[in-house]
Amino acid sequence: SLFSETRGPALKGIVEELSQVRYLGQLVVSLSGSAEANEFQEMRALFKNFECLDGAPATVIWSDGPRVQALLGQLRAEGLDPGSDGKGRATWLAYGYVLATQQARVVATHDCDILGYKRELLARLCYPTANPNMNYEFAKGYYGRVTDRLHGRVTRLFMMPLLRSMKSVLGPIPLLEYLESFRYPLAGECSMTTDLIRANRIPADWGLEVGVLAEVFRNSALKRICQVELTENYDHKHQELSENDPRHGLHRMVVDIASSIIRNLASYGVEFEAGFLNTMISAYVRTAQDAIASYSNDAKLNGLSFDRHSEEVAVETFSSALRGAGLNFVRDPMGAPQIPNWSRVISALPDFLNELREAVEKDAQDAS
């Protein structure tokens, strides 16, 4: 969670709904992008009345707390880069804290900016992995993104057209078939077992959702992976396109997502060079333009607002982001490393999980 979300309506609604849930053994909130102790205190205050099954309070991890930062520095000194501050690292820290406390077998993750949140969403997300009779290790959520218009631009106009165009250029590749099988591959909502949490490496940036799916593909059997509809419709904080600045907004998000897809495909033997990138981008643009025409028809049929020009601008921005991600890969195939999985961290630093738990708790005490 970002501190700015404490001021919005979404998080308060989520807390109210979660306070009525009676099956949670643990609630962990990972706060990133907040260096001030008073901001950390404000986030904790939102959860002050929440109680888990055994009466324990919610845990808020202050990612910028001095002791947590010292531990991250210790990882860097060991050659284990935890990445920069962001959604991926915040999620990774929360997973580490859950492993350290040894209370959970299944962990559900979702964002803190969901508008109109209902506790049924969490129940549906947890059930496939929590029910031992179902034998699933990983569940991915999906939902509709419609109000008076179609939302989910990155999924509609980038992710799905890119996967389809890559299949047309490269032919059937198991990883592409797998990624395309998800109804909403960029959904932030998923649940998984702690065994997978130990094994998965994840990106520190906006490539988190794609990176997690790729790691689950690598570390789990397909028959133990499922997807579940969480709600009929879903709304959250909308980001600006930022067409002229790849460092912000959806533009940056698409650069990170494209980088994650390219690097994961390369790890399965796909070669990326300048000529292939040009072909891939051309195929993507054509497929995305066809998608715009289809969405225009959907909007007309259902009486929705549809700005075709803004959709075309989005595709142009996303194609620029794809080119940037591809050229970055050609220049530096390794790129920014993924955060090491928890199995490797524990192997290198056997006491790290206990130290993380202690750091989280002491940072919270000192900030009080």
Question: What role is predicted for each listed range?
Answer:
Residues 101-117:
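Short beta-strand-to-loop acidic/aromatic patch adjacent to the donor-nucleotide binding site
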Residues 240-368:
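Terminal low-complexity segments of carbohydrate-biosynthetic enzymes
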Residues 226-247:
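Active-site donor/metal-binding and catalytic loop motifs
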Residues 146-153, 170-189:
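A recurrent flexible, glycine/aromatic-enriched loop bordering the glycosyltransferase active site
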Residues 13-25, 34, 49, 130:
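Short, acidic, metal-binding catalytic loop of nucleotide-sugar glycosyltransferases
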Residues 38-102:
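Active-site-proximal specificity loops/subdomain of glycosyltransferases
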Residues 204, 214-233:
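Catalytic donor-sugar/metal-binding loop of nucleotide-sugar-dependent glycosyltransferases
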Residues 115-144:
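Conserved donor-nucleotide/metal-binding helix-loop-beta segment in metal-dependent transferases, i.e.
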